């Protein structure tokens, strides 16, 4: 069966703050710098991202208990950016690459689906929401005349940047 442990953003924020100055942060930052290379668009936030990654990994370790598998589902907006000072997409991508499926928007079913896909395929899985409402101005600016697609042929694949780095060009904005 599936068990869900619910924790508030405040619990997460408290755990995050307790990791401030953690001696493991510099090693994670170095790993991120090497991984991102030229895609490191915001080097100044890497220490906070490393702090957040350690927070989540320690959270998993401390809450896993007898369970064999763990997934994470978070809420990354609207207060996340203002309170934590960053968006979690890159860290979520890294955790997904390490075999811990992560979804945003409190998408519990999506996280479970990613986990099932991972077990079935023995590979990292990303689910993207298909949104058929590509704005006309975006179509005109980015697609029309450049590619042989009509507006009706286009869609948006979206899921907050949790796509594993092997699936896209790696940079810290981390969007497909």
Language-model features: locations:
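Metallocofactor- and cofactor-centric catalytic cores in central/energy metabolism, strongly enriched
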Residues: 2-71
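Hydrophobic alpha/beta core scaffold segments
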Residues: 40-169
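Single conserved hydrophobic/aromatic residue that forms the stacking wall/gate
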Residues: 170-176
């Amino acid at each position: 069966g599936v068990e869900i442990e619910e924790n508030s953003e405040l619990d997460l924020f408290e755990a995050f703050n307790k990791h401030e100055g953690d001696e493991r942060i510099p090693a994670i930052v170095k790993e991120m710098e090497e991984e991102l290379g030229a895609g490191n668009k915001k080097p100044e936030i890497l220490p906070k991202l490393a702090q957040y990654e350690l927070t989540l990994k320690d959270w998993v370790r401390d809450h896993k208990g007898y369970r064999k598998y763990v997934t994470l589902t978070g809420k990354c907006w609207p207060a996340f950016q203002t309170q934590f000072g960053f968006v979690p997409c890159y860290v979520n991508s890294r955790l997904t690459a390490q075999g811990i499926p992560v979804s945003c928007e409190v998408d519990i079913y999506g996280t479970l689906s990613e986990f099932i896909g991972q077990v079935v395929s023995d590979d990292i899985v990303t689910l993207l929401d298909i949104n058929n409402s590509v704005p006309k101005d975006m179509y005109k600016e980015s697609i029309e005349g450049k590619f042989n697609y009509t507006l009706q042929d286009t869609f948006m694949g979206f899921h907050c940047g949790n796509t594993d780095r092997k699936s896209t060009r790696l940079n810290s904005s981390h969007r497909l």
